[in-house]
């Protein structure tokens, strides 16, 4: 599974761990990705999306139909 939010496009970020002696080693910060199913009335079916908690809140505020319509215009596969 890709560690990427389908709505917001959040991806892992990269940086360094820095020890007390200032030694740098590579690391990555993964986003908090959740799988969530929604009923989309405009499509007439359920869709499973990989989302971050911010995207879940955005869908709760704006509505699943509007967000899915924007995803489809972007060319996102659902």
Curated annotation (Swiss-Prot):
One of its GO terms (cellular component) is ribonucleoprotein complex. Signal peptide: none annotated. InterPro entries: Ribosomal_bL28, Ribosomal_bL28/bL31-like_sf, Ribosomal_bL28_bact-type, Ribosomal_bL28_sf. Residues 1-28 are annotated as: Disordered. Transmembrane segments: none annotated. NCBIfam families: L28. It holds the Pfam family Ribosomal_L28. One of its GO terms (biological process) is translation. The keyword Ribosomal protein applies. It comes from Cutibacterium acnes (strain DSM 16379 / KPA171202). Keywords: Ribonucleoprotein, Ribosomal protein. One of its GO terms (molecular function) is structural constituent of ribosome. This is Large ribosomal subunit protein bL28.
């Amino acid at each position: 599974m890709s560690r990427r939010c389908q709505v917001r496009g959040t991806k892992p970020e990269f940086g360094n761990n820095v020890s007390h002696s200032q030694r740098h080693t590579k690391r990555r910060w993964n986003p908090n990705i959740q799988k969530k199913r929604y009923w989309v009335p405009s499509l007439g079916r359920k869709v499973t999306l990989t989302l971050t908690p911010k995207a879940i809140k955005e869908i709760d505020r704006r509505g699943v139909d509007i967000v899915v319509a924007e995803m489809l215009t972007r060319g996102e596969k659902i």
